[in-house]
Amino acid sequence: VGGEWSDGMAIYDAIVMSKCFVTIIAYGQAESMSSIIFQAADKRLITTNTYFMTHYGSTDAGGEYLSVQNWAKYEKHICEVMMDIYTQSCVGGKFFKEKYGNKPHPDKVKTYLTRKLKSGDWYITAEDAVYYGFADEIAYSW
């Protein structure tokens, strides 16, 4: 399930800052904000029937011209943070190693991910989530 940016990032930061080893298992769906929170874990497991979805989030802006302009700048920043998180996770993905070599440059990965997200919501299977680097492995049992 998705969620609000600020709430999700509070959870993301708490996981990243934890001194404990954190494993997250995605069940059913990891979409929007939950796909970002998922990236905070030290170990990211996804069940076989879970789907993964990422996209540029939606926003509403209203009010005075300058306020809307400032909000747009903040939204751009949010998108950059999101892309940095995904890039950091995916740079080690098998897909990007096959496409760009064993040590793909993060800028190439980020460019690819940006292009995919600009085409709309990006839905992928559990297998593809592992292939791209959004998840570490499929959890068949534990």
Task: Name the predicted role of every residue range.
Residues 2-11, 15-61:
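Glycine-rich beta-to-alpha active-site loop
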Residues 61-142:
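Charged, glycine-interspersed solvent-exposed loop segments at helix/strand-loop junctions
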